From Swiss-Prot:
Keywords: Endoplasmic reticulum, Glycoprotein, Lipid biosynthesis, Lipid metabolism, Membrane, Oxidoreductase, Steroid biosynthesis, Steroid metabolism, Sterol biosynthesis, Sterol metabolism, Transmembrane, Transmembrane helix. A motif (Histidine box-3) lies at residues 258-264. Pathway: Steroid metabolism; ergosterol biosynthesis. It comes from Aspergillus fumigatus (strain ATCC MYA-4609 / CBS 101355 / FGSC A1100 / Af293) (Neosartorya fumigata). The chain crosses the membrane at residues 47-67, 105-125, 132-152, 193-213. This is Methylsterol monooxygenase erg25A. Induction: Expression is controlled by the transcriptional regulator srbA. It is a multi-pass membrane protein. It is an enzyme of class 1 (oxidoreductase).
């Protein structure tokens, strides 16, 4: 990318098309996506490169979040088809008014809390040594790092989430998220500003940590990770469990049924993506798990 940076048109009149042509001429081995990536950063110039990162990241976040929520909004509007897959099928699906109220609040949180964090992400990633230049990382590196991100975030989320169910923290920070005992897709990021900030650190923290450890983390990997993390959060709040749900393929995956019990019983199942922390720490939610813990206590006391 440095060779391209030294020769792209510095004129403010340079268009994306001009820059794409330049990338194609000087670096024909680059993929189409890599050329688009370079043209985006070249267009904004190094003086305001943080703006380029902010635009990419925030637009990706908004498009991915609401696009992924859309199938669940449709499912909630068609109970005659999808009610049989609803986990809490005794409760009515959210009304259009509830969906809209939730959307307005989430947009407020996105612009007031998440957008400033996203703008600040570029200087943080440069400070930690996280790369945004071309070429992109290979698929093996990207996959391995995302798996590590999932494990680190899940650990952070478990202990923070469990702490937020302590009385004072629950009342001051976490109570808003539990407004809906039967969650739906949009509620994945329905939270107080403080909770949004604290849980957001669990998402951006692992990439920055690995970058500090000289693990060659790339912004493309971070965007892929954030995409998958959003998918996971939205799906776990969807309120639906299908025969083809991921947790039926990967038994250690949390899934909607796992997190739905957390909202239903207001206790336990604190992990975000996996089940192992709740199993190890004895915080599995639901009457069956509670009865099992009671029987184990009686056995130890006998």
């Amino acid at each position: 990318m440095d060779s391209l940076n030294s020769s792209y048109p510095q004129s403010a009149m340079a268009t994306y098309s001009d820059l794409l042509d330049l990338a194609a001429q000087q670096q024909p081995h680059l993929s189409g996506l890599e050329r688009l990536w370079w043209a985006h950063y070249a267009y904004w110039d190094n003086n305001i490169v943080a703006t380029a990162t902010g635009i990419i990241t925030f637009l990706a976040h908004e498009i991915i979040y609401f696009s992924r929520c859309l199938p669940w909004i449709i499912a909630d509007s068609l109970p005659s088809i999808f009610l049989k897959y609803k986990i809490q099928d005794q409760k009515p699906p959210p009304s259009a008014a509830e969906q809209w109220a939730c959307t307005k609040y989430i947009l407020l949180i996105h612009f007031v809390v998440e957008l400033p964090l996203i703008v600040l992400f570029h200087p943080m990633m440069e400070l930690c040594g996280l790369s945004f230049t071309i070429p992109f990382p290979d698929l093996r590196t990207l996959t391995a790092q995302i798996i590590i991100f999932f494990l680190l975030e899940d650990t952070y989320h478990y202990w923070l989430h469990r702490a937020m169910h302590w009385g004072p923290l629950y009342r001051s920070i976490h109570r808003i998220h539990h407004q809906y005992a039967a969650p739906f897709g949009l509620t994945a990021e329905y939270a107080s500003p403080w909770e949004t900030l604290l849980l957001g650190l669990g998402t951006i923290g692992p990439p920055l940590l690995l970058a500090l450890m000289d693990c060659n983390v790339h912004l493309v990997t971070v965007l892929a990770w954030v995409t998958l993390r959003q998918f996971q959060a939205i799906d776990s709040h969807s309120g639906y469990d299908f025969p083809w749900s991921l947790r039926r393929i990967l038994p250690f995956w949390g899934g909607a049924d796992w997190h739905d019990d957390h909202h239903r019983y207001f206790w336990g199942n604190y992990s975000s993506s996996f089940r192992h922390w709740d199993v190890l720490m004895g915080t599995v939610a639901g009457p069956e798990a509670r009865e099992k813990r009671r029987a184990e206590r009686e056995k130890r006391q006998a």
